[in-house]
């Protein structure tokens, strides 16, 4: 067990060091894009599956409530929370469209879509990023290494 824990911690340290050298430009670009979006009165739509759905909800909560400092609420919405909408779309269309349909209904040019997918290959995340681009939104993908199928439909890739 000791070796397993040591390996996990060492991997975490390695990934953080790697982010400093390999991801700082993309992280800065994402921060600038989100700042511009919110400052101009637009909103952020976040989505993902499983643990990524939980991450999307957590991020949206931090934007809407507050993060570290008292401030005005910021427009962010996790598309993973309305079970009636999700199951209706999944039933009437397909599970692959549960986020794209919501992006189409709620997104506008100037908004930012943030898709989270560990593999980068979740069909419903890819479809939502594609729909966001189609309607004039900017896109950010948070994925595992390489970005998978999300990479070509992301304006900014954080992998």
Q: Which residues make up each language-model segment?
A:
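Short, well-ordered beta-strand core segments
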Residues: 113, 139, 157-158
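Short glycine/serine/threonine-rich phosphate/pyrophosphate-binding segments
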Residues: 52-57, 121-128, 150
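Short, glycine/polar-rich helix-capping loops at beta-to-alpha or helix-loop-helix junctions
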Residues: 141-156
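Surface-exposed amphipathic alpha-helices with a cationic face
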Residues: 129-133
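A short, small-residue-rich loop immediately preceding and capping a beta-strand
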Residues: 43-47, 109-120
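Generic N-terminal amphipathic, Lys/Arg-enriched alpha-helix
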Residues: 1-22
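Glycine-rich, small/polar surface segments that engage phosphate groups of diverse ligands
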Residues: 35-107
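A short, well-structured juxtamembrane/interface segment
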Residues: 22-40
């Amino acid at each position: 067990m000791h070796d397993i824990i040591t390996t996990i911690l060492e991997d975490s340290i390695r990934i953080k060091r790697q982010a400093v050298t390999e991801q700082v430009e993309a992280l800065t670009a994402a921060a600038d894009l989100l700042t511009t979006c919110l400052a101009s009165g637009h909103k952020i739509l976040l989505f993902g599956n499983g643990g990524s759905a939980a991450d999307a909800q957590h991020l949206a909560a931090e934007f809407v409530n507050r993060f570290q400092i008292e401030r005005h609420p910021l427009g962010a919405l996790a598309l993973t929370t309305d079970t009636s909408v999700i199951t209706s779309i999944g039933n009437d269309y397909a599970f692959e469209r549960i986020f794209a349909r919501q992006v189409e209904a709620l997104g506008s040019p100037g908004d930012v879509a943030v898709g989270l997918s560990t593999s980068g290959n979740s069909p419903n995340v890819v479809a939502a990023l594609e729909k966001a681009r189609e309607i004039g939104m900017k896109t950010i993908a948070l994925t595992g290494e390489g970005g998978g199928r999300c990479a070509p439909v992301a304006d900014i890739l954080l992998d």
